[in-house]
Amino acid sequence: MAKSDVKGVNLGMGTGRRKSSVARVYIREGKGDIKINHKNFDVYMQLEKLKTIALSPLALTHTLGKYDIYINVYGGGISGQAGAIRHGIARALFDLDEEYKMVLKSNGFLTRDSRKVERKKFGKKKARKSFQFSKR
């Protein structure tokens, strides 16, 4: 359930994960400031596709610009971090207000994407690719 911060404003928290990235998201009512690792959102996420992925839970719930969001993200690359931020924002929105549960759940934002890189096997070139086979 959502907690209150020092000023008495509702504070939602959520942890999102994707590949090897982890994002801790803190949401509170505000004017729409988004900070990732103490940097502005537009400075940290420069690709438009990744911005769309990261902010999709806010766009879906029509809450873009209503909340101040503070994100601490580490691990992985920018694509995995964008997915982790999306998962974390969805969980934080759900923590803040449970009315969003049906919308977020039906679009798969509350579900952890469990796909990870498959490990390389010995006797193979990569995870599944084999060395060239010669019959003779």
Swiss-Prot record:
Listed GO MF terms: RNA binding; structural constituent of ribosome
Give the matching PROSITE patterns: RIBOSOMAL_S9 (PS00360)
Recorded superkingdom: Bacteria
UniProt-listed GO biological process terms? translation
Q: Which Pfam families match?
A: Ribosomal_S9 (PF00380)
User: Which family does this protein fall into?
Assistant: Belongs to the universal ribosomal protein uS9 family.
**NCBIfam families in the record:** PRK00132.1
Identify this protein by name. Small ribosomal subunit protein uS9
Q: Whose protein is this, by species? A: Borrelia duttonii (strain Ly)
Classification of source organism: Bacteria, Pseudomonadati, Spirochaetota, Spirochaetia, Spirochaetales
Gene designation: rpsI
